[in-house]
Amino acid sequence: MTTVKPTSPENPRVFFDITIGGVEAGKVVMELYANTVPKTAENFRALCTGEKGIGKSGKPLSYKGSSFHRVITNFMCQGGDFTMGNGTGGESIYGNKFADENFKLKHFGQGTLSMANAGANTNGSQFFICVAPTDWLDGKHVVFGFVTEGMDVVKKMEAAGSQSGKTTKPVVIANCGQL
């Protein structure tokens, strides 16, 4: 497993334990750039721990048990819709969608962690992990973290994807939290 050195010891680190087709695939560890995008990083961190309880949707504000509903090979793995499970839902810890915090960080390559959205200022809980350079997303999606360990697991997730984004097997966040 390749490990990338964290950029700041003050930044929180979170993890996903991933299953693919019901089989353990491994752990993905991510550093969240709270020093640059604190509100976005806090939303993701709290959804990893589940500490905020039940949301407006009546569902737990947690990624645990949710799936990566859209995995496009040579592009990205998208998840975070814990309310509907299909890319139409999700919920932030702030109750509603929240604004794009800033675009200081760039989509530099594989391992970039970024917010999925439906246009400007529509951030909720959906996110994606890039598996390739995606600089055309700069200025449109807020980058808030980076995979520091487990990129091999992300590549296994990508292998369960397709060009359409439909997964061949369920890719699930079996457990998650903060390190």
From Swiss-Prot:
Gene that this sequence comes from: ppiA
Compartments in which it is found: Cytoplasm, Cytosol
Catalytic activity: [protein]-peptidylproline (omega=180) = [protein]-peptidylproline (omega=0)
Disruption phenotype: Grows and develops almost normally, except for the production of tall fruiting bodies.
Regulation: Binds cyclosporin A (CsA). CsA mediates some of its effects via an inhibitory action on PPIase.
GO-annotated biological processes: protein folding; sorocarp development
Molecular function in Gene Ontology: cyclosporin A binding; peptidyl-prolyl cis-trans isomerase activity
Broadest EC class assigned to this enzyme: isomerase
Gene3D superfamilies per UniProt: Cyclophilin-like
UniProt GO cellular component terms: cytoplasm; cytosol; intracellular membrane-bounded organelle
Protein purpose: PPIase that catalyzes the cis-trans isomerization of proline imidic peptide bonds in oligopeptides and may therefore assist protein folding.
Pfam families: Pro_isomerase
Key words, A-Z: Cytoplasm, Isomerase, Rotamase
Superkingdom as given in the UniProt entry: Eukaryota
The name this protein goes by in its record: Peptidyl-prolyl cis-trans isomerase A
Family: Belongs to the cyclophilin-type PPIase family.
Record-listed E.C. numbers: 5.2.1.8
